[in-house]
């Protein structure tokens, strides 16, 4: 398989990741959990910048574009949520929604890791070392994200998804991730590096 076809898959998964995290941002905003929403805004920004890095490098090396692949936005938000107001939900429903959202996130990242391992193998088989390294870096980021979400799930399970505790932590989480987004978007030349 030509490397460009493999890179098309890699680019497509990155763009699907942007869409996934955008939907997760909406998901947690709907639940009134602004910290978790900011966390997904950060991951959305990371995914977008990763896709840009890949396409920019490919264009610089080959003078051409990585072809687009027809994509469908990941189905994250349950259909019934579009027909109801969040004020119509109770605490048990919201606890379950937090649990389901975190599980969906972990499952998404695990399926991304499986795909990336396959992409790395195929790129290495085509002797595309540089692109294989780009995919390996993305896999490392995804594995870190999996570890992070599993830690969040563990913490949430240990407090039995206690909403007052979850809500109390949101401002600190939001501040942390808004700072990370600012850092991601700051050009290197202004960082004094």
Locations of regions flagged by a protein language model:
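Iron-associated oxidoreductase/ferritin-like identity signal
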Residues: 1-193
